[in-house]
Amino acid sequence: ADGSKFRPFERDSETLARKWAPAGTPGLEHRVGGLEKTHIGVLSTDAANHEMMVKERAEKVARVAADIPDLVVDGPESGDVLLVGWGGTYGHILTATEELRAAGKTVSRVHFDFIDPLPKNTEKVFSGFRKIIVCELNLGQFAGYLKTIFPQFNYLSCNKVHGQTF
């Protein structure tokens, strides 16, 4: 690689990711620092550049959604109740779903493996249900996050914060 042409702060036009320069590669030497820079690597405190970079970083994260698998609904794709979980609630919600179905209830569930960005089909999945019950082992931060992105849905929270599983 010709180091005079290598621009480590330029971004790929499709993914907005910066170019990869494995450490020690001849011709790709450069400095990395925590201060914001322009696309050519010059330190910048310019307000317009800062705004552009903030928007560019947000867009980079949003574009990751194209590579995130769609949510898979366990159960009917529409109905009264959708149980929602993420992280360590997977097994507990699966068991609750099975027990509710054994009791004759119709219930569906989804488990989020990706939360920022959310899977592309999240809004479509949610639109099929009257109530969305978000089960969390915290104070309901994920439910709050979902409400900010999709405020049109009816969310209920099932939270447990005693340091124990459901």
Where on the chain are the PLM-derived regions?
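Flexible, low-complexity linker and terminal segments
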Residues: 1-166
